[in-house]
Design a protein with these regions (language model features):
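Acidic catalytic loop of the alpha/beta-hydrolase fold
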Residues: 218-222
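Flexible "cap/lid" loop of the alpha/beta hydrolase fold
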Residues: 106, 113-143
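Catalytic histidine-centered segment of alpha/beta-hydrolase-like enzymes
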Residues: 242-258
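Conserved HGGG/HGGXW glycine-rich cap/lid loop of the alpha/beta-hydrolase fold
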Residues: 9-62
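Conserved alpha/beta-hydrolase catalytic His-Asp/Glu region
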Residues: 126, 147-196, 201-203
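Short beta-strand/loop motif that positions the catalytic acidic residue
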Residues: 207, 213-215
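Gly/Ala-rich beta-loop-alpha elbow adjacent to hydrolase catalytic centers
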Residues: 93, 97, 101
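Active-site loop/oxyanion-hole signature of alpha/beta-hydrolase fold enzymes
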Residues: 50, 54-92, 259
Length: 268
């Protein structure tokens, strides 16, 4: 995969397909290639750009030691767009990627053609209470003690909430030991800190791009009403609830998810 020097880091990315640009942003810890169920479909219709965000698991983007924010990662994305000569693009963000996508649409409205926000929130206060500790937050959403956070246990809880039982067993049995050996869990402090600082609620009304907010009815990692709030505050937003889908709708309900996204991007 090629790399681009953007915003002070070397960012690993991939481009497939032809057509209007579509940039996919993965959730906390996930690398760009985790979009495989979407890329193989979307590349038939769009120029699909995926990338490894800072501190992504199994990624090859630089992992800076200094703290950063969602706005920082939105700036990374703009830098990649500039590197690729992309003036405007459709933006699809899943989970943490949706938080980055909101920052991008708020701060760079002229660069966003259409926006898709999947399984995401606009504030750390909308994260499921069971997962607050993973992001170093106390129950009142104030910053807790980073040193006391058992990241492996926290991601185990998140995975159990996000995936059906079969996928959960696969992830815990196969991927978690690899992540442990590579020191990935301990490297996630940067992304977790960015999630803890997420707060775009009061700026959602400034988003100009036509927006699809899509969430599963069995969502447990983030509070379901977060999507309803986003859809109500973003002008020209459409809310879709995928019946039976969990936080991991892009994997478990991939056919329905892909169809909803393509229908939205092609509409109007």
């Amino acid at each position: 995969m090629p790399k681009a020097r953007v915003n002070g880091i070397s960012l690993n990315y991939n481009v497939e397909g032809q057509g209007e640009p579509l940039i996919l942003m993965m959730g906390c810890g996930g690398p760009g290639r985790a979009w495989f169920f979407q890329t193989r479909v979307f590349k038939k219709h769009y120029k699909v750009v995926t990338f490894d965000a800072r501190d992504a698991a199994f990624g090859k983007t630089d992992n800076p030691s200094e703290p950063y924010t969602m706005k920082t990662m939105a700036d990374d994305t703009i830098g990649l767009m500039d590197h690729l000569g992309i003036d405007r693009a459709h933006i699809l963000g899943f989970s943490m990627g949706g938080m980055i996508a909101q920052e991008l649409a708020i701060n760079y409205p002229e660069r966003v053609q259409k926006l898709v926000l999947a399984s995401t929130v606009s504030s750390a206060s909308q994260i499921a209470p069971e997962l607050l500790g993973l992001f170093g937050l106390d129950e009142d959403f104030s910053e807790g003690d980073w040193a006391s956070v058992d990241v492996r246990q926290g991601f185990g809880s998140a995975t159990a909430l996000a995936f059906n039982s079969r996928l959960y067993r696969m992830l815990v049995g196969l991927l978690f030991p690899i992540c442990d050996r590579l020191g990935w869990f301990e490297r996630l402090k940067g992304q977790r800190g960015a999630v803890a600082g997420c707060d775009t609620l009061d700026s959602l009304h400034t988003i100009r791009a036509p927006t699809l907010v899509i969430v599963g009815t069995e969502e447990k990692c983030v509070q379901l009403h977060a999507s309803e709030v986003m859809a109500s505050r973003i002008p020209n937003a459409k809310l879709v609830k995928v019946d039976g889908a969990s936080h991991a709708q892009i994997f478990e309900m991939r056919s329905r998810f892909n169809r909803e996204v393509l229908d939205f991007l092609r509409s109007g």
